[in-house]
Design a protein with these regions (language model features):
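Aromatic-rich carbohydrate-binding modules that target alpha-glucans
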Residues: 74, 664, 753-767, 822-870, ...
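Active-site-proximal helices and loops of the catalytic beta/alpha 8
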Residues: 31-34, 157, 175, 190-218, ...
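Carbohydrate-interacting/catalytic domains
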Residues: 2-3, 7, 17-53, 68-71, ...
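Active-site clefts of carbohydrate-active enzymes
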Residues: 399-427
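Extracellular interdomain linker/stem segments of modular secreted and single-pass surface proteins
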Residues: 707-714, 806-811
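Substrate-binding/active-site clefts of carbohydrate-active enzymes
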Residues: 43-49, 57-292, 296-297, 318-329, ...
Length: 923
């Protein structure tokens, strides 16, 4: 270990209190003795925004003259029907401009608009419903006429900029409106690449992943290249703009996605035309489209829809090129963030590390915030949640850039969640929990996003159309019966009330964080968490001010007291938010005792700076190792022998290259998850860490070596212990995934020899279909599968064995047993769907007509379900006719399912989301 003053690389400006600061993002420079500089944790320009996310059609109707988009009076042509939640309701850009100061009054610094491009007004196949939401684009160069004009957009952007606010566009690269049909019929089921590969115009099979991000993509022919033959209605051959979008070979043309595995990347979203984003023409075209909006309209950033459904190579080109263009055109703070609808940080962080995008929407935070504030889960869970923020740390991005949110237009509103999670609690508690969720969002790391209407206490019974109420007076019956939190108002009137308690709360939180910037983008250090509902506490520390803010939130319905660790011994702290003593003092052991009222938050700030360090602490590296959650990420952890505000920079070196910074962490435990997916297995990587203390001293660790592990291959299907018959899909995935992988599948019958049953080289999922029929197996025969992955460099990896059994004759009926303690089964039935269920049954089932019980026996309602394929899922919802409110008219658990070949009988119990495969206790 080397310890010295980092004079050569630190800015020699002495701040108040004698603290020496180094320049943010200082370029690393090796010293003659091999030393490496300490660096500050990255703070990109966008770590302190307050977003307001608004659906223009549902905000305010400033110009009734554009309601029908110039398409006439027929709602099935114009898409305008203010009495239906799935149609245009009348909001527009003029309404946004008229109410822009209402938005600003919340402390908003950035307005995020749902897509405003010209949409297909109505898709008759979808309900029917209209493109009011903006996600069915036909013309990427024009504003939807229902929303206004180019001139009105310019006026809105100018007005926002004049008020110090930015404007973000919601953009789409994954798909367009549903225009392409198939000769084989509309909206066909997905056909995998393993069943039918892509073919060149000459008919030669190929894997598109071999060409993604590279020149030389093979020529395609709509008659030859796809599993379905794409066709256009003659009236729509030139509907899309720019014109290249009318080339049907620039789409995947594989049928509808089920949002799982390969088809999640290649399938159509409910018929929406899925772009061939592996094709260089699509990549170039999308980059050019969005460059134009930056250059011509001065937009400040993009929210990118459906990011996880587009291949990595697209983002690796799109993000850096668009960002570079924006900065060349004067947008130094241009910022892009993507929708990755997943709550696993090892996955969501993939897009900001390997894919080089700036940020993603923080879906993991949304789930954690709901668990804490609405569901009253153990407070300590938040501690582990924030500790895992290290997944996002790399050399050019980190978690502080992520937009955080509590609900949205797809999943539903925080107001709806607190009502559903706390039935019968009453308005006072619902408002308190809603406020608590917003306090957590504003005081923790990230850029908070307010979903329009949340500031007025909007609720709604669910997501999608049920969470898209108008702020102006509604005529939609489904909205008119919604209750609002914190008010006696209804949706029958305009709701632009600046005096609403939640509007005031949000405005106050924004103002407070502006006065105390550390609460916006200071280091977020986990401090304390109760094992049950109670206090969660963390510190926010600005590296320049060096004052510690202690934030303590209580999700219990009782007052709680906690001794919160700090970096200050015997120091005074003053209250800056919440109720309690105006001034408290930390103990000699540096704990600060705070009392927090029920469902409330308090914030205290140290009066003086954190004590200045006299020397950098010792730092050492734990042995680097592949992360359990992602084999392409190497977990590198630094142990720092001290307890104060430190910033630890990690470096990596391969071969004879120089040391490269791979991220700086400013909160303990100090870690990065280095992306090594692009390196060959066995490659030696050296790591070092440099700690920078709060007075500019640095210390270096010794070097630790690691070798890049081989990829892992895992069989996904069939499920372990399942029953199979006929043709079995055997599917595997690799971690990390590379287009160069080849996977061989092997099978063993009754512990016999392993036999190869096929190979697959088509990324991203590897599949063979094993026909068992010729084997004439007896019922119960054991079958084992394994997968062997090969890389071009000779690496070979074998999966764990997957064991299944041969099933007996096909089942014709499955039975679901349902228990209600009171025996009140009248009206309760099953909404059914899926390929397992007899179509004759599905034809009888509707939302207002669920499948009824066959009998009531021994206190249970029993539902016999006729089948046509017992190997497929039976999907179900237990509810009353038209019932969609948990728990009064619908059972919890969302869309549930079971596979009859594995579970011919299942049991469910009132209020319990579990699907049991044996009778559960009912006492």
């Amino acid at each position: 270990m080397r310890v010295r003053r980092a004079v050569a690389v630190l800015l020699s400006t002495v701040l108040a209190g004698g603290v020496v600061a180094s320049p943010a993002g200082a370029a690393p420079r090796s010293h003659g003795d091999g030393g490496l500089p300490g660096r500050h944790s990255l703070r990109a320009p966008v770590t302190d925004e307050n977003f307001y996310f608004v659906m223009a059609d549902r905000f305010d109707n400033g110009d009734p003259g554009n309601d029908r988009g110039g398409l006439g009076d027929d709602p099935l042509v114009s898409g305008f029907d203010p009495t239906r939640k799935g149609f245009y309701n009348g909001g527009d850009l003029a309404g946004l401009l008229r109410r822009i100061d209402y938005i600003r009054g919340l402390g908003t610094t950035s307005i995020w608009l749902t897509p405003s491009f010209k949409n297909k007004a109505v898709q008759l196949e979808d309900g029917p419903s209209a493109g009011y939401h903006g996600y069915w684009i036909t013309d990427f160069t024009q504003i939807d006429p229902h929303l206004g004009t180019i001139a009105e957009l310019r006026a809105l952007v100018d007005a926002a900029h004049a008020r110090g606010m930015k404007v973000y566009f919601d953009i789409i690269t994954n798909h367009t409106a549903d225009v392409i049909g198939y000769e084989e019929g509309a909206r066909q089921p997905y056909v995998s690449k393993d069943v039918e590969p892509y073919r060149t115009a000459a008919g030669r099979p190929f894997d598109d992943r071999d060409y993604a991000g590279r020149p030389g993509f093979p020529p395609l022919d709509p008659e030859v290249s796809f599993p379905y033959t794409p066709v256009l209605d003659p009236a729509e051959r030139t509907l899309k703009v720019p014109a290249w979008l009318n080339d049907v070979t620039l789409y995947h043309n594989r049928g509808d996605t089920t949002f799982v595995g390969e088809n999640s990347l290649y399938g159509d979203f409910f018929g929406l035309d899925d772009l061939f984003t592996e094709h260089p023409r699509v990549v170039r075209g999308m980059i050019d489209i969005y460059k134009t909006w930056i250059a011509d309209f001065g937009v400040d950033g993009f929210r990118i829809d459906t990011m996880k459904h587009v291949n990595d190579e697209f983002w690796q080109r799109f993000g850096p090129e668009v960002l570079r263009f924006a900065r060349q055109h004067g947008k130094r703070e241009f910022f892009m963030f993507g929708e990755v609808f997943d709550t696993t940080k090892s996955f969501t962080s993939h897009f900001t590390t390997r894919d080089r995008m700036q940020a993603v929407l923080d879906f993991p935070f949304q789930e954690a915030a709901r668990d804490f504030a609405s569901r009253g889960e153990p407070a300590g869970q938040l501690g582990q949640f924030f500790v895992d923020d290290d997944w996002y740390t790399d050399a050019d991005s980190n978690v502080y850039q992520l937009p955080t949110f509590l609900g949205n237009h797809d999943m539903g509103r925080i107001g709806g969640f607190v009502r559903a999670d706390n039935p019968g609690a009453g308005d006072t508690e619902w408002v308190a929990r809603d406020r608590l969720a917003h306090e957590l969002m504003y005081f923790s790391r990230g850029n908070p996003v307010i979903y329009y209407g949340d500031e007025q206490g909007f609720t709604g019974p669910g997501g999608d159309q049920d969470a898209r109420q108008t702020l102006f007076a509604s005529r939609v019956p489904d909205y008119l019966d919604d209750d609002l939190l914190g008010t006696d108002a209804t949706h029958a009137q305009d709701n632009f009330v600046s005096g609403h308690p939640l509007y005031r709360t949000i405005g106050d939180l924004a103002a407070l964080t502006q006065r105390h910037p550390a609460l916006r983008d200071g280091a977020h250090q986990h401090r304390y968490g109760d094992e049950a509902a109670g206090v969660y506490a963390f510190s926010r520390i600005d590296r320049h001010q060096q004052r510690e803010y202690v934030v303590a939130l209580n999700n219990s319905e009782q007052a709680k007291t906690a001794a919160v660790p700090t970096y200050v011994a015997g120091g005074a702290f003053q209250r800056v938010y919440g109720s309690g003593p105006a001034r408290v003092t930390s103990a000699a052991d540096r704990t600060l005792t705070v009392s927090v009222p029920p469902l409330s938050t308090v914030v205290y700030s140290s009066v003086k700076r954190i004590p200045a360090s006299t020397a950098a602490p010792a730092v050492s590296l734990a042995a680097p190792a592949p992360a359990a959650e992602s084999r392409g990420r190497m977990q590198v952890t630094a142990n720092v022998a001290g307890s104060s505000f430190y910033e630890v920079t990690f470096y990596a070196q391969t071969g004879r290259s120089g040391w490269t910074p791979i991220g700086t962490d400013d909160t303990a435990p100090y870690r990065v998850f280095h992306d090594v997916a692009g390196l060959h297995a066995g490659t030696k990587v050296k790591y070092r860490a440099v700690v920078l203390d709060n007075r500019g001293h640095t210390a270096s660790s010794r070097t630790r070596d690691a070798r890049v592990p081989p990829p892992a291959v895992t069989i996904e299907a069939p499920a372990e212990g399942s029953n199979v018959r006929g043709t079995v899909e055997v599917r595997a995935v690799a971690d990390p995934e590379r287009a160069t992988h080849v996977v061989r599948f092997e099978r063993s019958i009754a512990d016999g020899a392993w036999t190869t049953i096929g190979r697959d080289a088509s990324s991203p999922a590897y599949t063979v279909f094993d026909d068992l029929a010729p084997l004439s197996l007896a019922t119960g025969t054991q079958i084992r599968y394994r997968a062997v992955l090969a890389e071009p460099d000779g690496t070979r990896v074998t999966s764990a064995i997957r064991t299944v059994r041969y099933a007996g004759p096909p089942l014709t009926t499955a039975t679901l047993h349902y228990y209600r303690p009171a025996g009140d089964y009248d009206g309760w039935g099953l909404h059914l769907w899926g390929d397992a269920v007899d179509p004759a049954v599905l034809a009888q089932v509707a939302w207002d007509r669920p499948w009824p019980p066959t009998r009531i026996e021994n206190g249970w309602a029993e539902y016999d379900i006729p089948l046509v394929d017992d190997t497929q899922p039976v999907n179900f919802i237990m509810h009353l006719p038209n019932g969609d409110t948990v728990p009064t008219s619908r059972e919890p658990g969302g869309d549930r399912s079971f596979v009859p070949i594995d579970a011919p009988q299942v049991w469910i119990v009132q209020g319990d989301p579990t699907v049991y495969t044996s009778p559960p206790p009912t006492s």
